[in-house]
Amino acid sequence: ILHQGPRADLRKYSSDDRSETARRLTNLFQPPKPIEIEGRFFEEGLIHRTARGEMVRSKSEVIIADHLHTRGLDYSYERKLTIDGTTKYPDFTVEDMESGLTVYWEHCGMLHVPSYRRRWEDKLAWYRAHDILPHEEGGGDRGALVVTQDETNGGIDSERITLLLDRLFS
């Protein structure tokens, strides 16, 4: 790729809303539910826009993405992670080139819903089985897992996100 200008300008082209392939609505198990935003079509759940211009599923994810972006961290939203033939899509993947640390960030916004909680517990067990351990435990050989969640009233504590990022990337 030949590019004139700062490398950071290329990041905007790595987000899903710039990818024609990622924007294809090709779920084999249920019909797509596209919505139109500014003349472009997105899957129904991706309705919140971050400061970086990507579409995410919740306002809490917007806050997290904007914090990552403000710090200049190179992150991906819902990047495919395949280990031993099983694929997961962490909410955020942050690769810190300076430290070599890979952080998989999951935000749990609906733990009060029993089916959501069960899926999350299964996903957490999968992470543990594949040596992606919570950052509070020092992480694992394949990366560190950061888990945040909404408050019981549905809110999110932005200051807590800031403090967490200070501990992880300072």
Where is each model-derived feature located?
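Active-site metal-binding core of divalent-cation-utilizing nuclease and nuclease-like domains
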Residues: 56, 67-69, 73-99
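Acidic-and-aromatic substrate-binding clefts and catalytic sites of carbohydrate-active enzymes
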Residues: 81-87, 113-114, 150-157
